[in-house]
Amino acid sequence: FTTIHNYVDVNTMILRKGAVSAKKDERLLIPMNMRDGSLICTGLGNEDWNCSAPHGAGRLMSRKDAFDSFTLSAFEKSMEGIFTTSVARDTIDECPMVYKPMEEIMNNIKETVIVEKIIKPIYNFKASENAGGKKRGKE
């Protein structure tokens, strides 16, 4: 299955910005963060939600605030148990603490999807725009 976000559904004329289709019995993926993984869900077709669901956990803060708020060591600690080569100063803006908690998201989406499975990462990779370049964030 595929999960597309930020588009116009020409069949229903619904604009989904930051959302994905969650029609009745439709399978979809909602990513949480690089530590907690993703939710595999089945849509409920809730018209009050425009048959939609969020396309991800949602950020708690801006990228700049993330660089100002978290240290590389805190990021490293949060990723213990998951193999990754992506924990670096220039990816602090993607650390798990920057996103809303999975439990909160799962509670908030009960009216639009059924969470079938939580898939946890064993390996995580994030490309870095600034690899080898400007260093941002705190040590």
Regions found by a protein language model. Give the residues of each.
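Domain-length cofactor-binding catalytic modules of enzymes
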Residues: F1-E139
